[in-house]
């Protein structure tokens, strides 16, 4: 009887596996498994409404946070006979009477873009071009809704819709930039607008970048396909831009203000070293005061200065100084309100929130414990409630919390996994996005006490589709290395997994500072972070594993910052230790373990394959930095200081370790990668040649760091699969 039951169960399992639909690479790259989103949510200040662009892009509509139902159509391209069919973005004026509408958006770098802007009057339904000039950037309303500031060709302009005033005249490509960041500040400080209005719209302050002494990097461009750059049909061309590499000259930055009424420009006397940074300028509640953020080049000190935009006088408000470096998130998450400044800091070893009054006096630490604040949503100044996301329950879990003025903290979300929030402009409601390893995104509308009002989207259709493909599950696990370090990870096994067999393993990792790949969250991406590509590899018969080593986020400053001054050393050791641990499992073939990664993950792949212990049979490195001297100042020096200060640390790189490389290696790089230049792979390939090492390399014409466009991504993924199949099966 037992044999019969076992036979029936086995037969049913095999039949289920055979009946399941098979993944192919086209499914992955054609967005077949893309989740449905409640996207483009822009809360309307002071209300419980939000605005969003319609699916076809032709309308901008307001909805209720509470009900999710449409309230009114704010803009209709057809109704106002707009000279365009779809909208790429918009901004409501502070008084709610007009809108800035942008179309014909063209990307420049990761966050920057040009567009054509229009001013739309909601009551009269009239539509006017913002400016007759082209290539406008970051158009922004003044607080009094009377003016719009924008950038064109590196110069600042102000217009009221009728008269246009050019605020700066010295802007020039690759020399002087006004009001938008240079490449490295945009990329590493995460912003694309370097100006702000004062509280009543009578002054405009901006950051000026003099990049004339920054060295130029040139990317070679070819005709290519999809799209074809026909200007390079016969001869290749170049795109040259300023890119400061570690230890080299940065842009010289300064802060300026323009008096709108007087038409006068004044330089602000904000203290700053000649090689320092101004990563933000923000509005303050008083029209005669604004806030400038400054950092030293080592990035271990952040200063907030209050400055008078009319006189240039500046006063230090807050000084934040922590061991090793101030994390980028501190700049991004700091909130300046009417009466307060909310500052994140890991000064006590974990990222927490600190509340100051507007003059810089510390009121209190908002919350504390051995966990991390992982996002900041803001503060309701009427109630004193502060809303944030945290890993309070586990480094791999994210929940939404409120910290009340009386010092108590309340959890607003319930399901374990990954929770995020968007709050209404009056903080009465929020949209909660939840997902887990096994469940795609669920969007709910909730009250500010966490009560679910309604489910907006549950992605049941996607969940059913995934079930038809019989995806495996991401199984979390932990182990302790030979150095006594506890590491966490997940693995995906083949659906027909048999514990009595020996399976090949592919380790995917990113491993970069503060990054987390091991989180209880949904992913269907095509870059190996627990998404569809991992399930495809499992379908091919591999166990796919991801482990976050030392230097990654979610576990406090000691764990994250221990890689300081020696990027790649501990990270590689932890990936090798992962392979050794996996090789000891009864169902793993220790002689068939591979590793791959992208960007920092590509770097760590090379470092791991040359760590000294030959545990990897094969590896794939995509767009890797191979020597930190080739990467930009802001990112590299944050973790490594300069090559002049840390020569030994910079020698910890794949090129210096090339003689130790073991395993079959495939390298892939986009030829137009403006972030991690193909120079990195060129130089490493030359080192491999001189070391007489066999390898394979593939370059993607005119593709950037994401290697996307045309058939590029599908081709790349197929090369990765083929490489592991050819070398590990």
Where are the predicted features?
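Non-catalytic accessory segments flanking enzyme active sites
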Residues: 38-42, 53-60, 72-74, 88-91, ...
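Beta-strand C-termini and the immediately following turn/loop, strongest in propeller blades
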Residues: 51-57, 62-64, 92, 99-111, ...
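Short loop/turn segments that connect beta-strands within beta-propeller blades
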Residues: 65-68, 121-125, 160-163, 259-263, ...
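Blade-loop segments of beta-propeller domains
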Residues: 69-101, 106, 127-137, 321-324, ...
